[in-house]
Every structure is written in C-alpha cells, then in structure tokens.
C-alpha cells in the first residue's frame, strides 16, 4: 500500500486567491485520514491536488516516497470516489465496475475475478446485471466505490461520497465504509463537511478553516483537547457553549465564576493549569452541552436559567436555556435519567438551575481563541 506526504503545499487561484496555505501532513500506510471543515476551507482542493486534478502552486505531494506533482492522475495509482456517482446509465453494474480495467486491457478472467470479489465485499453481487436506474442511491454509491476498488490502487480518495444520500442511508453507508476499510486494508483520504462522519470514520482528523490546518489528531484528541475555539465549536453536536467569564486562582485551586456562580476546576484540567502556573484572568469558558448538569438552587455553583426551547431527540433532550443576563446555553440530558414528572416540567418558561462539570471545562484566550492548555 502507500504513504502520502504533503510538504508546504499551497494553492492559489488567479493572482491572489489563496485556497490552501502551508499544508503539511504525513499520512501513514493503511491510515484512514479525514479532511473536515466548512465549505470553502480548502479540503476538496487539497484532495484534488493529491489526485492530480488540480495543479499545485507550490510545495510537494509524495505517494510512497515518489513526488507526483508532475504525474497525470492515471499515473499516480490512486482511486477516487466523488460526491456524484457518475455511473454510465447504459452499462450494467458489472460493466461500470469493469470499465477502467478493460481500458487497461486487463485479461477478461482477471476482470471477472476483481469485479466479483469487490461486489461480494460490497454486497452488490445480485445487482451485477442491473443498470443504474434500477438501483437505489445507496446501491449506486456502492457501485461507485466498487468501480474504484477494482483498480487495486495504492490510495483511496473519497470526496464527500455520502452527501447526496438521505440521513438514514448516510448512517448505513457510514457503517459500511468502516467495514469496507477493514476488508480492503488500504490508505484512505476522505473529505467531508460532516463532523459526525469525520469522528466515526477517521483514524485521524484534519480540521481546516480558510485554507489552513487548524488541528490534526485522533477523534478523541480533537474532542477532548481542541486547540482553539473554532475546533471546539466545530467538533461535537450540539456545539460547545462558549462565553466570557473569569478564571480565578486561589492557592493551588482554580475556579470559574460564570454568571455569579463559583465552580471549581477539578481533575486533570486543574493539574494542567497548575503545572502551567496559570494565573487569574478573563477567559472564554467552553462547556459541552452534555457536561451541563442540573443543580440545587442553594448550591454556590448553581446558575438560574429559563427554558426557551425543548428539542426531544428520543434518547436525549436538547434544552435551549437563557440565564438571567440573556446568554443562551444548550443543555443535553439523556431521557433515561429523567422521571416522567421531570420530563413534563421541561417546557418553555420552566425555571431550573444548572452547573458545569469541573473536570471537562475548556479555557480559551479571549483575544486569540487559543486553548490555554493545548
């Protein structure tokens, strides 16, 4: 299989429109890497430069130690799956999957062997004689993936392959891609704007914004220790609550004081603040909705709030609450933790008291947005 290395890669359109800037990344053999970010961040452009579909303005792309900047896409030994299936409507599934092999004049026996093997892995053997119009969206996407698989390429590139599918089918195909990766054991580079896809599929995630890499890490690393506010708010759903408050040091202990409450920082976060000798200062505090809990009114750590919106998600409630100064927060509560009477109370206008779990809070510089502990 193959390693992929990008060194100081830059892409400029026209004279001064910078799409990708200073992109440096080493991708290990058989790694599943995901580029994720909002529209226009440069993720698809980067993938297309790896594929050879976009020229590189500066820097180098290497596949298996060979610089491929000047190689045509067909000479890079890569396979690519696009957002659009791009199947030939007049050809059967078998013929679509075999098309590139026949162009290369691969022997017919080998064509049959490769296509049927890929079809079996993807669960589309029974559709090999059908034409694309007789297939569902998910089945067509499997055919597109199979067409790439039969090429037996070193690197598998996937550009938002699930974005045309409905939510249910997207979830199903996401699971199938995870299983596919385990079966074919090759290097994957996958592009998506969906952080759920990124978190569930990737060995590592590359989070991009405005052409720059913001953070590279495992799903756990980027979720637990986002390097800045952009990553913190982009990764995780519902998104992280962020607001200005003060971090207060009292001896070897740290507290945050949002909305008049006093909440102690505990666990590893407290140890890290102490090790860095962080002093009292104004910060932007980040708290994920699942780390907001209900509190007793008399507790010094309690923050009074009023429910404005209750989103019933089935296994959990997403409460949009407003504290007394007008700031809005999201609270995520598993429904299994609530009694029937408590559920009935969670309606517009209901007052409740919340607090934050002290061991999982995040602290950002209010001017730069950088995580104080990253």
Model-identified regions with their sequence ranges:
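The feature captures the beta-strand-to-loop junction immediately N-terminal to the Walker
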Residues: 36-38
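Helix-to-loop junction immediately C-terminal to a conserved catalytic motif
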Residues: 51
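Conserved coupling/switch loops of ABC nucleotide-binding domains, chiefly the family-specific signature
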Residues: 57-60, 110, 210, 361
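ABC ATPase nucleotide-binding domains
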Residues: 73-234
């Amino acid at each position: 299989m193959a390693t992929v290395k990008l060194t100081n890669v830059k892409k400029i359109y026209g004279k001064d429109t910078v799409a990708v800037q200073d992109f440096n990344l080493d991708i290990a053999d058989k790694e599943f890497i995901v580029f994720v970010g909002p529209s226009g961040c440069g993720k698809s452009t980067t993938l297309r430069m790896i594929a050879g579909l976009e020229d590189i303005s500066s820097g180098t792309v290497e596949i298996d130690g060979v610089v491929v900047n000047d190689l045509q896409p067909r000479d890079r030994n890569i396979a690519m799956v696009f957002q659009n299936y791009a199947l030939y409507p007049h050809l059967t599934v078998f013929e679509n999957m075999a098309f590139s092999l026949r162009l290369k004049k691969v022997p017919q026996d080998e064509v049959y062997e490769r296509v049927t093997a890929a079809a079996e892995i993807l669960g589309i053997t029974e559709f090999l004689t059908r034409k694309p119009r007789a297939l569902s969206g998910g089945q067509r996407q499997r055919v597109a993936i199979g067409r790439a698989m039969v090429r037996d390429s070193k690197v598998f590139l996937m550009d938002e392959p699930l974005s045309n599918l409905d939510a249910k089918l997207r979830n199903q195909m996401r699971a199938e891609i995870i299983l596919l990766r385990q079966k074919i054991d090759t290097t994957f580079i996958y592009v998506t704007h969906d952080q759920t896809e990124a978190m569930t599929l990737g060995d590592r995630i590359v989070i991009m914004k405005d052409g720059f890499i913001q953070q590279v890490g495992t799903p756990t690393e980027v979720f637990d220790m986002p390097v800045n506010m952009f990553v913190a708010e982009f990764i995780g759903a519902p998104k992280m609550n962020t607001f200005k408050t003060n971090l207060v040091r009292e001896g070897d202990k740290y507290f945050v004081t949002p909305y008049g409450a006093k909440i102690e920082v505990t666990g590893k976060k407290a140890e890290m603040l102490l090790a860095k000798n962080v002093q009292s200062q104004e910060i932007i505090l980040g708290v994920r909705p699942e780390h907001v809990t209900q509190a007793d009114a008399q507790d010094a750590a309690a923050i009074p709030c009023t429910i404005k919106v209750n989103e019933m998600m089935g296994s959990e409630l997403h409460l949009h609450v407003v504290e007394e100064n007008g700031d809005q927060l999201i609270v995520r509560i598993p429904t299994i933790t609530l009694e029937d009477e408590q559920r009935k109370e969670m309606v517009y206008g209901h007052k409740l008291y919340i607090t934050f779990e002290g061991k999982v809070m995040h602290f950002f510089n209010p001017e730069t947005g950088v995580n104080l502990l990253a």
